[in-house]
Amino acid sequence: MIDRILDKLGIELNDMQQDAMQAVLHTDRDVVVLSPTGSGKTLAYLLPLSQLIDAGDDEPQAIVVTPGRELALQSATVLKNMGSGLRAMACYGGRATMDEHRVMKQVRPQIVFGTPGRLNDHLDKGNLNRYHIRYLVI
């Protein structure tokens, strides 16, 4: 599946992406990747997540914490463009939490991208079921 996604996106993985992806897929340990902006960290975590997430489960299984709204939206778009079939949602300030919750119930995202404050709001209000979360990307 990963090869199909890479072909679809027209991307060849660099060494950092390959190493990070293999570490996530084949160990039960936390993985830390430090790399400059634009080096492919988003794909380095989304490709393994596309293999690890249960597409048949309608509950959020991964939370991706982003520093700002733009990166939350961009990351959700990258996941969509991958064609993995996984559902995602970007959560960020500047719009009503209640509106996001309504969309969340409709979309039933398996991966939730969001800013720290907005994710905390949804967790505090019980809008985001944390009991199925298996992966956290910061």
Which ranges hold each PLM region?
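Conserved pre-motif I regulatory segment
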Residues: 1-34
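The conserved Walker
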Residues: 35-39
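Conserved phosphate-coordination/catalytic loops
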Residues: 11-15, 43-44, 95
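Conserved nucleic-acid-binding Ia/Ib motif block in the N-terminal RecA-like helicase ATPase lobe
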Residues: 3-4, 57-124, 132-135
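Walker A/P-loop NTP-binding motif
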Residues: 18-29, 42-57, 73, 78-82, ...
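Conserved P-loop NTPase nucleotide-binding/switch module
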Residues: 138
